[in-house]
């Protein structure tokens, strides 16, 4: 099969497009013929092996344990393991697997769900990780209730666009923080109020929020707390700095240390993808309450360009306002390697 392969950590220069064997699968796994794979900043971090704790988390100390990058996927079940009962060959599925930047990938049956009927494979490939992260952050960590005021920093990115829509599903009044060019898009997915971080500072407003979701930003913990109600909840998801050891996790560490001594709930979490939450997302998507936002699609052999695009963002996103730096909306990779040009 055709696949993107890396034998060492590094930049996109370490990625090669070549033929390899199809992956072996366990009894509780399925083999998926991948039609599209999703790209987010996590793909870049795993490719680069940065920050270093990623390597300690099981990805391989000196070189990647799994030579094919990618987890988000959408495709068709090719083969099922003997213990799999949820799926059968021919089912169209989405979720997460191992090595999705390839024509075939293996996936646990508890990490997949049937693809929403109203989505293309490219759209469905951008749901599992970003959608699950937003869902769990708001429902489980933020415990958002109807009528609460929710601030979403990084609202125009992959997780952010889902967070805006899901917060509205939960009945919240949503304020989104994004750049000038993304304001209309963020409004279109349901934001009640939009703050242009290039012109306005959310902390300087009189408004205080019950729940703040900071997605990949670098606003200081003290500034975030000033924008939070006295009993409010702050959920920090990621953070983008150049640190090789902590990356953007220093704020999360400080939040966890401070939390026992203040009235506000401060913290972070690590999302996980599971069949039950994928079903929740599937039902919301099919009901028209949540829609994936796709920026562009690259053919499989241009995966390095897609990863680089996500890592760098647009020129506006590289502007000197790192405290509210946006992640680009999800990029998907088409496994049809015969595709000659990317769609924009």
Regions found by a protein language model. Name each.
Residues 203-211:
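A short acidic, Gly/Pro-enriched loop at the edge of an enzyme's catalytic core
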Residues 81-83, 174-185, 202, 218-222, ...:
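Short glycine/proline-centered loop/turn elements that form peptide/ligand docking sites
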Residues 215, 219-290, 323-335:
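Glycine-rich phosphate-binding loop and adjacent beta-alpha segment
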Residues 92, 149, 232-233:
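Short glycine-centered segments of the SAM/dcSAM-binding site in methyltransferase folds
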